[in-house]
Amino acid sequence: MEYRLLVGLEVHVQLGLKTKAFCGCKNDFGGIPNSRTCPTCLGLPGALPSVNKELINSAILAGHATNSKIRNIVKFDRKHYVYPDLPKGYQISQNDAPICNNGFIFIETSSGLKKINIVRIHMEEDSGKSLHLLESENRSYIDFNRAGAPLLEIVSEPDINSGEEAVAYLNSLREIFRYLDLSDCSMENGSFRCDVNVNLLINENDVEYKTPISEIKNLNSFKSIKLAIDYEESRQKEEWILHRKTFESIGKHTMGFDDKRGITVFQRSKETVADYRYIKDPDLPLIKLDDVYIESIKSNKMVELPLDTRIRLKEQYGLSNFDVVTLTSDKNLVKYFEEAAMTSSDPKRVSNWILSEVLSVLNDREISILDFNLPPSYISELVEFIVSGKVSGKIAKEIFLEMLKRNVSPAIIINEKNLEQISDKSFIESVVLEVLNENPKSIELYKKGKSHAIKFMMGQIMLKTSGRVNPAFANEILMNKLRDV
């Protein structure tokens, strides 16, 4: 049996705007329950919505970043369904005329770049949040602080063919939205949520069949998403072998994911679009966007996106794929690197220092690069001391620790503590001769082919110079003297 896994993703991104989508309530995470509500987001009679202009601007910017076609007419619809956390009895969304459609992004996979097509991006408001307490209390609470929060939903084509590709796609989307400062995209806080649609395209005797689509919900991490897709692939394959159920006969159903057991669990048959009874929202007029306005959003707000940055960093600085992927995980980290590399003769070594020493400090302190106390110029200056041979790598690490404590440049510490590397060959030769005279047994061991004797003598040279001697020069002179013994 030949088959191909088909995965489509519906991603909800809560935008980091100051106010909600259709009212003036503050758009923040957390806080006292029901403290950021008004008659509009609570759906009280007579309250009328008004469109947050920044919601539309954000959608346009997202459309540009995903190579989408952007509509000139914005229409909002009412999506009707009954649920306790939906106070109006409908959600303001977009049905048949999403603001963006026919887009695409590229993802990075183990076999290279892959194009993932995007069906649509539409604007909508979030619902409230239901809080289910212990069964013994026999009650639930609703927090409407989130009701009306501005959302973009990004729907992909089923172009994703593995759990690994799904995670790569989500990573790419999250990076794009973070680079554009549209959202913090925190799965933990619910500002980046994803529903996964999975089925199989099976080929038997040149006849194609599609298995029923499983929409998997309640996925709270990229790890869970990958596990759910991998499990659903094996489950649908087995079910096809046993029951040969097709999409035409069953349609679509909703599944949950049990994190503890690592399996998907059937929840319900999926409603059709008609169940939502979409109508145009009579309280929100059509909004016309001319081409000049749409392009102005791009020219004023678009930044270099992560994939483009990675390609440029490789070409401009000769960095490895690992380096550029790590650096571009945070646009502020890229900025820090480029400011340091700008004045350095060895950008690759600057990258190594940032990805090892600087990131280690950030992780230990649990801070971002924005809170790091050393400016990029200090890292560049320290690297230049290493490149020029004025300090060794070992001494540089000690200098770096002192820089962290005192917030001063490496030059100040080097001058104060007389740490500049000794590169005077005449002086080094005198130290080497002194070590040879003091260690005749090591010379004999060297003559017998014992390599550890060289390491011992180099250690003695370093000890006598407090680690300041140029190790390459010292090793060269030592080997020359040993050959003459």
Curated annotation (Swiss-Prot):
One of its GO terms (biological process) is glutaminyl-tRNAGln biosynthesis via transamidation. GO terms for molecular function: asparaginyl-tRNA synthase (glutamine-hydrolyzing) activity; ATP binding; glutaminyl-tRNA synthase (glutamine-hydrolyzing) activity. The keyword Nucleus does not apply. It catalyses: L-glutamyl-tRNA(Gln) + L-glutamine + ATP + H2O = L-glutaminyl-tRNA(Gln) + L-glutamate + ADP + phosphate + H(+); L-aspartyl-tRNA(Asn) + L-glutamine + ATP + H2O = L-asparaginyl-tRNA(Asn) + L-glutamate + ADP + phosphate + 2 H(+). It comes from the Bacteria. PANTHER family: GLUTAMYL-TRNA GLN AMIDOTRANSFERASE SUBUNIT B MITOCHONDRIAL AND PROKARYOTIC PET112-RELATED (PTHR11659), GLUTAMYL-TRNA(GLN) AMIDOTRANSFERASE SUBUNIT B, MITOCHONDRIAL (PTHR11659:SF0). Belongs to the GatB/GatE family. GatB subfamily. This is Aspartyl/glutamyl-tRNA(Asn/Gln) amidotransferase subunit B. It comes from Borrelia hermsii (strain HS1 / DAH). The lineage of its organism: Bacteria, Pseudomonadati, Spirochaetota, Spirochaetia, Spirochaetales. The gene is gatB.
